[in-house]
A protein has these predicted regions:
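Short active-site oxyanion
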Residues: 30-36, 108-111, 161-162
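Glycine-rich, flexible N-terminal cofactor/catalytic loop recognition
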Residues: 1-62
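Glycine/small-residue-rich loop that forms an oxyanion/phosphate-binding "nest" at active or ligand-binding sites
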Residues: 69-118
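Loop/turn-to-beta-strand initiation segments
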Residues: 7-9, 79-83, 160-161
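Class I SAM-dependent methyltransferase SAM-binding "motif I" and its flanking Rossmann-like core
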Residues: 99-157
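Conserved helicase motor
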Residues: 59-66, 139-143
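A contiguous loop/helix-start segment that scaffolds small-molecule binding in enzyme catalytic cores
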Residues: 6, 160-209
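Short glycine-rich anion-binding loops that position phosphate/pyrophosphate groups of nucleotides
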Residues: 16-17, 87-91, 168-170, 193
Length: 209
């Protein structure tokens, strides 16, 4: 059981592109908390400004999370209510923050999720592939680690479909590795989801190349 004298960590989902894709509850929480910890305060400032929200904000990301976590835990124990957000989508899903959530569980600090958009589930929903079972890689590794992972996927009979994030700069090399290891399979690619220039591709790897 959580200690009722402690504060609350709110894990808040934010838009993945279109700023209007945010829940009323998320806005209520962001307006009510004592502090917002953000992956990139500049990007989160843009969202808060759009909705007229002014709150103290600090960075909390891969570079500084392990240094800051003890201080954040102490403030939560003092009764503060803190919202954790990422640059886009749900925190922790291929984003920083899992270590803070774990510490809160260990320290009996209440954690509440405020669900929101996810690039992963949004892409799967419009992919044309079944969404009942798939393997999520996260961000695809680079070079030989990528090829090693693809070979493991090929050898695993339980994995029929998989999803991953990739940067535009590395996409071509990743597709070439998929073609060489998994063959000319059907794929779906989405970019700029919910934004003005949203694009999709459905077809084979060779067609994408």
């Amino acid at each position: 059981m959580e200690d009722e004298t402690f504060g609350v960590l709110y894990v808040v989902g934010t838009p993945i592109g279109n700023l209007k894709d945010i829940s009323l509850r998320a806005l209520e929480i962001l307006k009510s908390v004592d502090l917002i910890i953000a992956e990139d305060t500049r990007r989160t400032s843009h969202l808060l400004s759009y909705y007229g929200i002014s709150k103290p904000m600090e960075s909390f990301n891969e570079r500084n999370s392990f240094k800051k976590i003890d201080n954040i835990i102490e403030r939560l124990k003092s009764g503060m209510k803190i919202a954790q957000v990422s640059d886009a989508g749900m925190p922790v899903i291929s984003d920083p923050g899992w270590n803070l959530v774990r510490r809160c569980h260990e320290e009996k600090i209440k954690v509440e999720v405020i669900p929101g958009p996810s690039a992963l589930t949004s892409a799967v929903a419009i992919s044309g592939f079944p969404g009942t079972y798939f393997y999520f890689v996260g961000f695809m590794p680079k070079d030989k680690n990528r090829r090693r992972l693809l070979r493991k996927i090929k050898d695993n009979e339980l994995i029929e479909r998989f999803a991953f994030f990739e940067s535009p700069e590395r996409l071509k090399k990743t597709l070439e590795d998929i073609y060489n290891i998994l063959g000319d399979c059907k794929i779906f690619i989405a970019r700029e989801l919910t934004k003005l220039h949203e694009e999709h591709f459905y077809g084979t790897v060779s067609q994408a190349l």
